[in-house]
């Protein structure tokens, strides 16, 4: 369902939620709430999107959904939602840097087992770190953002094929071009990991759509590349890989109400 700022769109979303509830025969009175994970920076009060260039959803408001659903509702930035899931999956972590390797790149900072929001809600927006001022044009209007090198879209554009076709070819190790494209991707990723680790001395979590495609060999390559480029060693055990793929933000968003319920018991 493609986003559009129309009553028809919000009605359709509400209808699909109702259909889902009916299909799986959930008891409505036991539904804790509905979390909507979306691309775009959410306002501090959670009432709407205040920056949404990718989806052009800056007019999206929480009330667009809550007025059509009989449940508590909340909006959450997809990258922050992904971080909630990684926190849930890694109870041993106090702090971390999350790379959300989705169609568009995202990120989040975890400190003291909380997702850091920042004064204006854009803490952890690592996709707009500039790694080459003469690089490709980013959707934000600047050049050389990490988005243009390490998003799934950037990888697919470089390869000219979808990720689901790229990785089987890569693992065959028969195409020097495919191997080089992946090596370039990992080099840019390692560059960003190195710099962020100097700011946040904590494990790095590779999460989202591309994460399940990473192998032990890839993690070893990243760790070795980091060792040669940084004054401090980031052991490969400090590079964690998420397992929930493209559904990471959706699951993480839902956990808000699950955790709230557990704490109320």
Q: What are the functions of these language-model segments?
A:
Residues 5-27, 148-149, 154-216, 241-242, ...:
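Adenine-nucleotide phosphate-binding core of ATP-dependent small-molecule kinases
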Residues 74-76, 238-242:
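General small-molecule cofactor/ligand-binding pocket signal
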Residues 40-44, 81-83, 106-107, 116, ...:
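Short, active-site-adjacent cap segments at secondary-structure transitions
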Residues 226-239:
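Charged, glycine-enriched surface loops/patches
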Residues 263-265:
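Nucleotide/phosphate-binding catalytic cleft detector across ATP-hydrolyzing
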Residues 2-9, 63, 68-176:
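Glycine/GP-enriched mid-protein hinge/lid loop-to-helix segment characteristic of carbohydrate kinases
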């Amino acid at each position: 369902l493609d986003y559009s700022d129309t009553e028809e769109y919000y009605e359709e979303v509400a209808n699909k939620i109702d259909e889902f509830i009916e299909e799986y025969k959930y008891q409505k009175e036991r539904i804790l709430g509905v979390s909507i994970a979306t691309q775009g920076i959410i306002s501090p009060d959670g009432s709407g999107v205040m920056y949404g260039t990718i989806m052009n959803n800056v007019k999206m408001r929480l009330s667009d959904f809550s007025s059509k659903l009989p449940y508590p509702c909340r909006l959450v930035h997809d990258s922050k939602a992904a971080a909630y899931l990684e926190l849930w999956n890694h109870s041993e972590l106090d702090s971390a840097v999350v790379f959300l390797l989705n169609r568009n790149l995202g990120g989040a900072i975890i400190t003291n087992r909380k997702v850091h929001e920042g004064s204006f809600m854009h803490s952890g927006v690592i996709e707009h770190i500039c790694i080459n001022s003469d690089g490709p044009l980013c959707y934000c209007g600047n050049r050389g953002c990490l988005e243009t090198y390490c998003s799934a879209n950037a990888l697919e554009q470089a390869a000219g094929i979808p990720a689901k076709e790229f990785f089987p070819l890569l693992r065959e190790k028969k195409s020097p071009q495919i191997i080089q494209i992946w090596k370039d991707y990992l080099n840019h990723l390692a560059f960003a990991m190195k710099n962020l680790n100097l700011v946040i001395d904590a494990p790095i979590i590779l999460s989202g759509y591309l994460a399940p495609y990473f192998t032990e060999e890839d993690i070893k390559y990243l760790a070795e590349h980091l060792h040669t480029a940084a004054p401090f060693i980031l052991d490969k055990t400090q590079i964690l890989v998420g397992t929930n793929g493209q559904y990471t933000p959706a699951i993480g968003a839902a956990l808000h109400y699950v955790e709230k319920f557990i704490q109320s018991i």
